[in-house]
């Protein structure tokens, strides 16, 4: 979920382990040559999740930490690939903390259904995050 701390925690862990770090959102933006939010505005959720899946399926996990986008969990194909090739860690963060961390939802690139609120998006993904996780780490700190 956006605002969970995936990039911050992933980057810190990669430095600690002397691994490479990949920010999935940055890889996606490099592929589409625009911001995620612009792409979502132009092409919508379905087109974006297809691109996201392609990017995730191309990752080589040899001594690499990957911070996926929060919507990666919407693709069974991508998540099964991640579980087969890596350890999946779910950063568990309360909705209250997420909503405090995300200031401008309309510019953040959060993949949502039409008219879907942040809370509805959070609730839609919560069980999926738990289902695919090999490990759960609470991350409600600042």
Regions found by a protein language model. Give the residues of each.
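NTP-dependent small-molecule kinase module
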Residues: 8, 12, 16, 87, ...
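ATP-dependent small-molecule kinase phosphotransfer cores
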Residues: 23-72, 76-80, 123
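A glycine- and Lys/Arg-enriched "phosphate-lid" helix/loop adjacent to the NTP-binding pocket
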Residues: 84-127
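Short glycine-rich anion-binding loops that position phosphate/pyrophosphate groups of nucleotides
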Residues: 69-73, 94-96, 142
